[in-house]
Amino acid sequence: MRYSSKKAFLEDIETEYARLEELLADLTPEQMVRPGVCSKWSVKDILAHLNEWHLMALDWYAIGLTGTRAAIPAMKDIRPLNRKIYEKHKDRTLKQVRSSFEDSHRKMLKLIESLSEKQLLTPGYFPWTRKNAVITYLSPNMASHYRWAMGHIRKWKKRELAE
């Protein structure tokens, strides 16, 4: 999704986060750790995935401010990276993952809120983003990623109810 303003970006994030939280509220802890939501991943694993991508985006920004270009994964590297993320977090408890996800979401919001509209939307404003606007690196890890997660969770819930 292309955003024309910081306000629209923040509103989309707030809306999708609330929708995700509402969807999660209907699940029991047992359901949230059951595999099979997205391949072998559980809802907990999806939240760990979202958290890790938040942390990577925060790192990219912080590294970029030092004048260094962060190692942002190429499309061909995403699948192996996601497998590593799963392996890294699979043994964490649901409580740990929920807490980490909520914390990283807040940190992303704080970063976005700290940026002016010009900083957020102007291509090349930050040298590390080259010709892109910084929103290009932040937006895929927020509302659109939440929509991706909700799509998998909803499909899984339908399958679960059908059984």
Where are these regions (language model features)?
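Short, contiguous alpha-helical
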Residues: 33-80, 120-163
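Extreme N-terminal tail/first-helix region
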Residues: 1-19
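Active-site flanking loop/helix segments enriched in acidic
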Residues: 28-31
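Structural signal for well-ordered, non-membrane alpha-helices
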Residues: 17-25, 54-62, 102-116, 147-150, ...
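Acidic/histidine-rich alpha-helical segments that form the ligand environment
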Residues: 81-121
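Hydrophobic packing residues in well-ordered alpha-helices of helical domains and bundles
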Residues: 10-13, 97-101, 139-142, 146
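A short, mixed-charge helix-start or loop-turn motif at secondary-structure junctions
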Residues: 2-6, 87-91, 131-135
